[in-house]
Amino acid sequence: MLTRKQYELLMFIDERLRATGISPSFDEMKDALDLKSKSGIHRLITGLEERGFIRRLAHRARALEVVRLPENRNDQTLPPPAKAFAPNVIKGGFAASQLAGAPVAGPSDSVTLPLYGKIAAGTPIEALRDHSNSVDIPASMLGSGNHYALTVDGDSMIEAGINDGDTVVIRSCDSAETGTIVVALVDDTEVTLKRLRRKGTSVALEPANKAYETRVLPPDRVKVQGRLVGLLRRY
């Protein structure tokens, strides 16, 4: 039987994975459960893992997978969440209309997406508008809408599980909920992949690496170009 806090944390992780495909950060879990320190989150996660409700994914920073839910929520083995991805900071310099390239059908279980170039996962840089490359993506990774891919160059999102050299899959959109990892166009000149947060009347572009600072900007300086929906990694 789970404690109340274990249950609340399990439900929060499950809801976030199903909504974004990405595990919430320890800070997000701490805030969601109104705890004062992350050590409490570590203890709750260990308890959930020992009871077989979640498991940690190897070789990924803080990546978690929900295995089953409690009996009062149909306790049963769950299918893997929609590709639990580990996103990282990305830069792209293109407008949403330029990125809305329709996927091209590839093999029966994959889709070919335009690979628009290498994006710095650090300080925002001007996007590389390379339309000559493409990448095959598992069809199960994609939902509705238009998608494109970018290659990560940098380490500003490593605590979100996004590493240098990863390929991130982006769904084109012009808005996103707070806490979502997005491709954001800043001042119509530079594009970056960061976690979007709304702070009062301002917009914060938050890295997942303590070596980088969060940028807080007026909303008229930031345009959402897409949201992270998947990640591919080669070993």
Swiss-Prot record:
It comes from Paramagnetospirillum magneticum (strain ATCC 700264 / AMB-1). The record marks 121-122 as: Cleavage. It comes from the Bacteria. Represses a number of genes involved in the response to DNA damage (SOS response), including recA and lexA. In the presence of single-stranded DNA, RecA interacts with LexA causing an autocatalytic cleavage which disrupts the DNA-binding part of LexA, leading to derepression of the SOS regulon and eventually DNA repair. This is LexA repressor. It holds the Pfam family LexA_DNA_bind. Its EC number is 3.4.21.88. Keywords: Autocatalytic cleavage, DNA damage, DNA repair, DNA replication, DNA-binding, Hydrolase, Repressor, SOS response, Transcription, Transcription regulation. The active site is at 156 (for autocatalytic cleavage activity), 194 (for autocatalytic cleavage activity). CDD domains: S24_LexA-like.
